């Protein structure tokens, strides 16, 4: 069963691997954020994604008040490689949507690399709507990477 919950201290090394964190400064910044998971930390909110209490991923929710209106959130998730393509992403999107809509959000958006077919399927199976292509969003050593953007709206807010 898939759950979203605050991190346990003992999950630090596993979470570093899942999030592919490199460098001591980044590790320490993550250690601080992880210790405050389950609560807003500046404009970030992190939760552990677990399958029967085993850590399988990380959920990040962001709200930047200067760039987004109240009630609009951006969601990201990372799953360990062995857990991808098994429907976990779809379950996480549904759980997160339910939780953050209940907390008052009216809109949640997310994006993924245009070639990440598994995540695109997860967005669509979870009822999210494709908004468009974010052309050249990231520059990976001179190669521009396109992303596809999805969102879901709380029509009951």
Predicted regions: what they are:
Residues 102-112:
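Conserved GNAT acetyl-CoA-binding A-motif
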Residues 3, 14, 74, 78, ...:
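Amphipathic alpha-helical recognition patches that constitute DNA-binding helices
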Residues 85-99, 117-125:
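Conserved acetyl-CoA-binding loop-helix of GNAT-fold acetyltransferases
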Residues 79, 113-114:
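Short amphipathic helical patch at the helix-1/turn junction of helix-turn-helix
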Residues 76, 83-87, 132:
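Alpha-helical hinge/cap motifs
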Residues 1-82, 99, 143-155:
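GNAT-family acyltransferases
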Residues 66, 111, 129-146:
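Conserved catalytic-core motifs of GNAT/GCN5-like acyltransferases
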